[in-house]
Amino acid sequence: MEQKILDCTLRDGGLVNRFYFTDDFVRGLYQANLQAGIDYMEFGYKASEALFDRREFGKWKFCREEDLRAVVGDNKTSMKISVMADVGRTDYSKDILEKKDSVIDMVRIAAYAEQMGEAMEMVSCCKERGYETSVNIMAISNNTDEEIDRALETVSKSRADAV
């Protein structure tokens, strides 16, 4: 099994500061990750603007293409760009573009064990659009071993690239 390093500083930190990071800070972190040899940098969420008010959150809650490109350009580097998309909080059919039109390389789909069906629909949609995908099973410590096994079995039968 090949291991890759994913930096989720922005996405995780955004939970504390409502995703209000300056472009200079984000550029600095991007450059630091490049120098450190990080494989993937997760910028934030692809959250639905129908569910979340842009006036209450910084731009990294939504990771619009123009905001990403303002920091990374065309990202002509070996580091891949990732975003997280939560089941039920992303309008993935609208918010996730075709890969050919995006600087994003991987969509990390976050779901609770009982949401694996919808998560697999998101995986399929993202794969059809040309993205790498990963599934993040949330709050897994609240699940029984059987629930975890079922969720992992579902993911293993999907087109997801990683868990």
Segments (PLM) and residue ranges:
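Short, small-residue-rich loop/turn micro-motifs
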Residues: 9, 45-47, 159
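Active-site beta->alpha loop and helix N-cap motifs at the rims of alpha/beta catalytic domains
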Residues: 34, 40, 45-155
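Metallocofactor- and cofactor-centric catalytic cores in central/energy metabolism, strongly enriched
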Residues: 16, 39
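Short catalytic helix/loop segments, enriched in acidic residues and glycine
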Residues: 23-33
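Short, solvent-exposed loop/turn segments at secondary-structure boundaries
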Residues: 17-20, 55-56
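Short, intrinsically disordered, charge-balanced linker/junction segments flanking boundaries
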Residues: 155-163
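N-terminal amphipathic alpha-helix/helix-capping segment at the start of soluble metabolic enzymes
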Residues: 1-12, 19
